Amino acid sequence: MDHQDSQRGLLAQWIEESSRIVFFGGAGVSTESGIPDFRGAKGFYHQDREIPLEQVLSIDFFTVHPQAYWEWFVQENAREGVAPNAAHRFVAGLERAGKLSAVVTQNIDGLHQRAGSERVLELHGNWSRLICTGCGERFTLDDVAAARSGEVPHCPACASVLRPDIVFYGEMLDSDVMEGAVRAISEADLLIVAGTSLVVYPAAGLIDYYAGERLVLMNATPTPYDSRADLIIREPVGQVFEELGRRSRRP
């Protein structure tokens, strides 16, 4: 058995022995679904663009230039074939089996829900949901055709500009979501952290609430928390869970 097989085997064993698993995921969970991560070599931050991504995704930029934001949004949502990958499907299966307490995700793509997960805590929101900046009414992308065309969408009720239900740079994370994440992680008997560099706070600091003895870090590059991990896996996230899925189906 090689080192990778040994690591996967240990992770499979820990999953089998656990009943309060929390999966804490970042952008690297969705790269195998066709969505670039942020800080990888091919990530959003390394793409040539006229306006830096952090500026496009700031609340100040959106407030002043909503048209430019929605044009970027349509371009990013034009990616073909984006669908849940093996990681999303495996995690959803853990929830159905009664072994998963929660998914805590930094992603805004909604792929965990599309895979069937229901206990999802979205730290940074979900860009398939819209909120009216005037009356606070909520909509989905399917409710407002303009949001998919690159036009600035307006509220059908009060005509104010609609914004995506995400946490822009310059905004605070939702306190209820953070409290739910802290509670789930503090009660977990296995914490699997995948596809995140753990350098963005306050999200990265959630690991400090984990009191268990089995911390798994699964990321392509080292993280500031590696010294605290009980298992470190340097493989693509979806690839690992695809293999774990095959193992679980074997007689």
Model regions and ranges:
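Conserved catalytic core of sirtuin-type NAD+-dependent deacylases
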Residues: 1-251
